[in-house]
Amino acid sequence: MAVPKRKTSPSKRGMRRSADGLKAPTYVEDKNSGELRRPHHIDLKTGMYRGRQVLTPKESA
């Protein structure tokens, strides 16, 4: 069974754990509609992605 040769220092332990924290999701303002959307995602209000119409938006009821 593998056993560590040296004790992990608090600094190394902290560096390893630094990637474990949750980050708030990022949003960008859409150029056409002004709505907030996730980057690299389709704008669900307009159905546009990178300047192209990729899906037809649902009609608001």
Curated annotation (Swiss-Prot):
Residues 1-16 have a biased composition (Basic residues). Residues 1-33 are annotated as: Disordered. One of its GO terms (cellular component) is large ribosomal subunit. Keywords: Ribonucleoprotein, Ribosomal protein. One of its GO terms (biological process) is translation. The keyword Ribosomal protein applies. It holds the Pfam family Ribosomal_L32p. InterPro entries: Ribosomal_bL32, Ribosomal_bL32_bact, Ribosomal_zn-bd. The keyword Ribosomal protein applies. It comes from the Bacteria. SUPFAM superfamilies: Zn-binding ribosomal proteins. GO terms for molecular function: structural constituent of ribosome. Belongs to the bacterial ribosomal protein bL32 family. HAMAP family: Ribosomal_bL32 (MF_00340). This is Large ribosomal subunit protein bL32. It comes from Allorhizobium ampelinum (strain ATCC BAA-846 / DSM 112012 / S4) (Agrobacterium vitis (strain S4)).
